[in-house]
Amino acid sequence: MAMNTLQKLCVVCSKCNECAMDVECLKYCDPNIVSMDSTAFRRNGVMVIHLYRTLYPALVSQNAVQTSVLTLYMEMLLQGLYDTMREIDMALTDFGTHRDRQRYYRRVLKLDSCNRHESITITFAPELALTIDLATLNDVERLLCKINCVYGAVDASQGVAVCRRLLSLLARLCDICPVAGPEIYRETVTCFQCYEELMAVPNQGRSINRRMQGLLCDHITIKKVLVQLDMDAQAVEQDMGDIAIRAPSVKGIIRAIKSLASFSPASYAYINDAEEALRGYNLFSEIPDRIYSLSDYTYWSKTSEAIVRHVGITMRQLNVSHSLWKTLRTELSRYHYGEDLEDVFTLGEGRFGGDERIYVGSIFAAPGKVVDMITSMSIKSFENNPLFNRLHESNEIYAKIKSLIEEIRGVGDGPAAGAARSRAEAASGAGAGGEEGAGAAAGRGNTGGDEGAGTTTAMSSALECGDPLLRVHDVNKEVNVRKRAYLKKVSEMGYNKVMACIRNQEHLVTKLVNVNLVGTVCLEAVSKIMNGFLSRQRSITEAETYPDVAESLGYDEHLYVINNLVHKRLPSELLPQLGQQIYRFINGPMFTHYLDRHPLPYNVNMAYACDNAGILPHVKEDLVRCADGTVVPSDWMTVGYMGFFRFADIRELNDLQKMVWAHIRELVLSVALYNETFGKQLALWRVEDGDEIGDGIILTYNPESPLILRRGDRSYRSRDLYLLLYKHLSVDSETLADAGSRASVADLCQVERPGPIAEQRSSTQNVKKKRKRMSLLELVRDVDGAGGDDLVPPCLYK
């Protein structure tokens, strides 16, 4: 089966990604080695130039009409590949002359300039313009969410220009490398996908801002664990093949790396021995005191291990491993090229020592191991805090476990030996004097006689004092029991808090240290917003070919429609549905969950847009009041003649937003009242609806031609809503009238009152109507009595 154009483009994108990754790695390689074997580089460069001259112009043309994440990304990638490969080629030519590696790296890595900042100015009105500074991927995503909320107030041409500048900034931030640099994103700033994920789970009574605090975003950049340290040495040994035989020193280095990676500390080996000793005991076994103590200490040691992660690599091992890998690289370089390798990571290598390797990083250390080491070092530093003395007892616990195991092995191991020993101890205790031995056996831990002697002395002293309460109650013993219980509870609570804190911080360190790939969130947002502005831009060109109803209609027709609507009232049961329509037209094109398989209502999409844009609560309240609407037309009919979507003398963005909301509310409610009054089914559409648009009024958001009336194969434009409604009446009358009597609405208004409806039916039997025939007199009369017996044009019931 032949591939379509989209599939072919995906294949080309995959190959370009592979080439981009190789070129990005080439930036950090020794230029002397690259110059020796540059055949593949130049061959790929020729292919990139060919794609740039043939495919790139087509992508730019496509993105000027309709965008997608793939076409936008391909445009960025081809432009970046072309510029990068040209820069590397010129830098290699320059290196052949001056032989200065540092100069080469500064040019290729662009260390002497910074082009990762952008200031964008958006003009909303002649006296209202805002400037936004951008420096990270998070800033781009947040700006697009804000533009989505003021979508109707931004000019279409300006919106497309802003999206193009944002795309250019994304290209500079990401370059051609799929791995995101740590300076181009902020992991603690959430995106709109983080918000949508939180909305899918119960909020448990917490606000969205509180739930998003401390949340790490894994959408703008996606965390990937790509390297496993334990597998590196084996994989390198397999790749080298015969080199290990011809270069004996290489084989010895690999053997040292393997032994270093497999090393694990032996200080906690007694835990395994303790578990083996405890495995022979069950619920029905007689448990000796030593076994009970061994189980108790093993439990506490595991509790400590739940907090302190004992990793298989220490700081010294990390430095030794880095040194061994560096030596291996040098040996391979001498074998292949006859000289030492000096890449960008070699510069300043001797300056780092101690724990600095963690913070600088190593190309030979797996990120997961570094994360474990940072966690372990943090816990060791935390253990030095005297407020948590329990953590200092870890070594004592292991020492006690060791001594118990040695005692058990000395007298015999297993349940049988333990039972015999227990019986012997019980017999000796009974023979020695009864109650003291029984008390020690019952106490499990009170194996010595000093505590019993001290308690007996205290009781005797209390009895001598004559306190009757102390004769039947040991207060000192109860105080000690309560004290131990309290300390245990506080200790458990402290451990839980420490574990939660460490777990959260470990997530942050993992996000920072591991490889993060650039996500598609920003490109998705740019594509949606840009497609909306492109649709509006196309509608401007198309509207110029449509007749303007203002050329044939005037202010009288405008007043005629208003006078027929202003005394009516909307049915209150329609307000919830109309409120949803208001939210639909106020919201931008970024959140379209009403098109999902399981669609969400328009108000939920609007809530997503407001929360991600950071709209203040009192502004949200104003929006809700606007969308709730009223049944009285005088409350929403505020737009003047020929003034729809024309905003003058606006100096505050909040005022501009409210005016946009008011215009959209008037559009939705006036059309609904028009349908109720005149018995029509006039629909409303957004300009972004595309092929789904049918007959009705199309909102373009453009001040030049904000409204377009489509009726069959004819379309009209206007800046006045009520002129379009009058035109719709006229077009409907022409459709229903006979072919020989196509009079205008104004002429039909002068016709005498027709006879009964029954006499009119004979002239309309051959006319196909969309709705059930009914008495139009009741439709057009003023039901509130304000209009008396006045009627609307007779054309409505012909």
From Swiss-Prot:
> Per the UniProt entry, what is one GO biological process?
viral DNA genome packaging
- Role summary: Component of the molecular motor that translocates viral genomic DNA in empty capsid during DNA packaging. Forms a tripartite terminase complex together with TRM2 and TRM3 in the host cytoplasm. Once the complex reaches the host nucleus, it interacts with the capsid portal vertex. This portal forms a ring in which genomic DNA is translocated into the capsid. TRM1 carries an endonuclease activity that plays an important role for the cleavage of concatemeric viral DNA into unit length genomes.
The protein's name: Tripartite terminase subunit 1
Family stated for the protein in its record? Belongs to the herpesviridae TRM1 protein family.
Could you list this entry's UniProt keywords, alphabetically sorted: ATP-binding, Host nucleus, Late protein, Metal-binding, Nucleotide-binding, Viral genome packaging, Viral release from host cell, Zinc, Zinc-finger
- Residue span of region Disordered: 416-458
The GO molecular function terms of this record are: ATP binding; zinc ion binding
GO annotation, cellular component aspect: host cell nucleus
Q: Which taxonomic lineage is given here? A: Viruses, Duplodnaviria, Heunggongvirae, Peploviricota, Herviviricetes
| Residues binding ATP | 674-681
Subunit relationships = Associates with TRM2 and TRM3 to form the tripartite terminase complex. Interacts with portal protein.
Keyword ATP-binding applies? yes
> Which residue numbers delimit the C3H1-type Zn fingers?
191-219
Biased region (Low complexity) positions are 416-429
